[in-house]
Amino acid sequence: MAYPADFKYTKEHEWLKVDGNTGTIGITDHAQNSLGDIVFVELPKAGAEIIAGQTFGSVESVKAVSDLYAPVSGTVTEVNDALNTSPEDVNKDAHAAWMIKVTLKDPSEIAKLLSASDYEKFAAEEVGH
């Protein structure tokens, strides 16, 4: 799997794409592959505050329910409501099926995240390849 180079990643398998002061957040292809068929996504509402490293929602698959962890702190400005009716979009293209958009509270948090190549190595080690 090629991970988009302009995204940043967490060891909990979320991605962040930054555009100015806005961060778009989703889960990685590695995460959706590990989860299997996604059947439900629980996300915060617009206006909610999220804190880096803390849960902001969950993803339910046929295998398990997994928490979503915020890669950065901020205020939710937009939620991908299409995932309410089509959560399987995450399985089809995890890097296009974003979950939430936030206004970044502390852009310096971005430096703590993994690059695409570092995340790819981390994910490969996790599965033992």
Question: Residue ranges of each PLM-predicted region?
Answer:
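Short, charge-rich, low-complexity interaction segments located
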Residues: V79-D93
